[in-house]
């Protein structure tokens, strides 16, 4: 109560502070159950209960007003059973397409800085879009069920005004996307009308029907994205074979000169703002204005708005005296203030500013790795993740909020405090950077050994967080730090798709399609068993390091020809044998090693796992002067 009392002291009771009030209540009551009845589940927080109550109240009020219902007592109390069946609400969802291409389709120049800035910029585009729609409908953040990763779900009133406002909103936003990015980015939206009983899943399946209808509407819009005028406008641009390009993103319009280099306005603005955007230790605010400031760097946003970065003092000045001030956001911290929309949870962990530094700090071979991952069957989890009697909007909202917090904020702690390491002597946080971590989608780059460790930690943390109910599939590619960025993203995405195609998903693919495993198999069999044996035996055997390549080649040949040269394999193992006068302990270790290796080589699954383990071990011991071996 003291938290609420002290925070409310600086809040004025006007509409400008409604989101700040919500922030205070969220901070204080997110982990207090809404019900203390012993015969009820206590899985809905007091915050979510109050937030949804406020959202429904606003929707009901707008519905009553548009339908000229003025006798509230009669409609809501005397005839409440009838009202519960009326389609009072719209569940609206919007989804931005083209996010990945927008983020990754850049040159390797200042790649890490550009990647993280563009990722955060897209997050702000979605936040700005959501807040603009809410403002046009005179609603608040309470009406947001979920927002992140280019997706959003809102609870809106089922009125004609809402439907017309949504149509105008989508047209305005897509027009801005066309004007600024052509067909690269598009937003598709869809909604479904529903009653209170539908949201309570009074009739089994009525709640899941809402989301099926929304998904179908969005799919139809994405199939028919552009009108005839849109297409004519898109085709009106004539490219010149000799026209200049932005050195970062390769676009050929809205160009400017920066330090003698040709850069588009967006990349130039993001570069100037990048330190404020991506530095996790820098306290700043992201201020939205309806007029481009004269003396300050600003980046264009939809709806004729502009993004600039303020210190706390600059923000206070804007709030007080700038007539063009619209709203502001904070990152990973709660604040209150005039039209301070909300804090944005952001996975912003970063250990270095260049890929080359990450490669140099990696163990063994000097390479970076790219991790791409997302939750398996997330859509089905929201629609069918609960038994029918528990499948309600309260639980969907709670699940959405907690998943968003996990991937956008808790992931920073996962990176700062590693649990699993390939290199047991490493210390400190991960040698890596979070490029993008949305509602369920993750992109991490870093030293190859730390990225593999981070992937395992992330999987284990999600399993613990969801009590085993949610799984994640991932792809991890390993590259030189100068490898084209878009190709890194594309190749790692292909590896992720291979994992998604594995039986039961819940998998990770390393290197290429030949190294796809369920997480337990990778951790327990590949690393915990085979990699551990190689490390224990080979680390004290100089001959073993050079013979590993020959053993690896022999196993590969077995796979390709379905034949194993037993004599050759026995010869290679024999070369690892200790001298006749070696201690008994060393002889026993060798005998165990050779027997186990001989057993593994004759079994398809074990042989496959052994190949991956050898890859990992060779990478760990590879020295700079023989990386080309």
Regions found by a protein language model. Give the residues of each.
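Charged, helix-rich terminal subdomains or tails
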Residues: 1-150, 154-629
